[in-house]
Structures are given as C-alpha cells and as structure tokens.
Amino acid sequence: KRLCSKHRGVRKVKKDVLFMCQFFYPEYISSALLPFQTAEALKDSGLSVDVLCGFPKEYIKDNSKVPLHETVDGINIYRKKYLQLSRSNFFGRIVNYFSFTFMMLMNILKCKKYKVIIVYTNPPILPLVTLLARKLFKCKIIFVTYDLYPEIAVNMNAISDKSFISRVMSKINKNLFREVSRVVSLSEDMKNYILNNRGVDAKKVSVIHNWATEELHF
C-alpha cells in the first residue's frame, strides 16, 4: 500500500528511506562507513534513499570543501552543523550527544516525507527523535543497535549501574525497543541479550553482521 499525503490537492508519495545518523560519508570511521554502504545497497535495490546526518569535523582531514547538501551515488545527503567538542572526555561527548540530537529534533519535519527511518544508537538519545517522528507521521522505525545502553556505559565505568542516569536509560531503552518496527543487532549474542532483557518479540529482531552490507535483510 502506497503511503501518500495530500498537499494543496496534490497527492505526494512518500520517499522510501531516511537514514538518521551522526556520522556518514565522507568520514572514515566504521560508524560512518557502514551506514553509507547500507544506503548504497538499498539505493541499488531500487529504493529512494536520503540521509540526515551531522556535518563532519573530527573524522575527516579537511571539511572546508564538504557541502551541506550533496547527492552521492543517487543518495541525497543533508548535513547539519552542531556544537562539536573534543570526544576525548566525558563532558565533550555528552555535549556532542545533546547538541546533535537537538539539531535532529529541529529538523523533525523532514521525517514526514519518508516511509521508513533507519536510526543508530550513536548518540544513544538520538532514537527518541525518531519515536516522536513515528507518533507524528506514522513512519516505520528500524533501530540499528551498535551498542546497548546503559550496559555499555556501565561496563566502561562511565556511570554506575545504580545511578539515576542508568535507571532512566534502562527505562527509556526498554520502551524504545518495544516501539520501533524492527531491531537490527550485530550478532546472535546481542540478539539473545536483547530478547532476554528488552522484552522484544523475536520476530522484530534481525541479525546483520557489520560486513554483510550487500544483502538486504530488512
């Protein structure tokens, strides 16, 4: 069934997929490369694919020639500038997380143009923006879990498992996993952990290894 909306008497067909992620092409880290490769695979399969991401700074040698908007291999990339501090300390990472998430929230109206939004766990609060988009625009959400929060933060001794932040993150993430349309995990072990600790229907969870970018598992 085609998802359409009316605007001044003209029926507009929604685009297929929007990627929402902090890092993307031309940045050279895995959390930028993997979404780019997935976007290319979806585009090659015949889907329309756009990207809403952060403007590159830390993981690129020179960003002076990087445009805010460009089309690469048929993929429309929209880059948004946000406050970026050094990621070498906890404070800088927190500022970056909230700054980028706030910028995505300010651009949430763009989400109404798409049938599906693919969102990643970096930063960990970013998926909340897509949940709001789901409620507002009835789009489907595919949640790609690179990391599990608050567990990863606790294991890195960034927060205590008894802390207020940990309890809030646990509550948010349990609801998040239930609300999204699909969950993508990177391994069978991660999938099993999600099923045992997030209360998710097994039918919603797929395993896609980092290197399995050629096949479409969604």
Predicted features, each with a name:
Residues G9-N76, K81:
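N-terminal subdomain of nucleotide-sugar transferases
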Residues D16, K115-V116, R182:
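Structural motif
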Residues Q22, Y82-G92, F137-K171, E215:
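Acceptor-binding helix/loop patch of EC 2.4 sugar-transfer enzymes
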Residues F55, D189, I208-W211:
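Carbohydrate-associated surface elements
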Residues Y97-M103, V116-I152:
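An aromatic- and histidine-rich active-site surface loop
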Residues K110-Y114:
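Glycine-rich phosphate-binding loop signature in dinucleotide/nucleotide-binding domains
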Residues L128, L132-F137, S163-V183:
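Membrane-proximal helix-turn-helix segments that form the acceptor-binding/catalytic region
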Residues L195-N196, K203-K204, A212-F218:
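Acidic anion/phosphate-binding donor-loop and adjacent secondary structure
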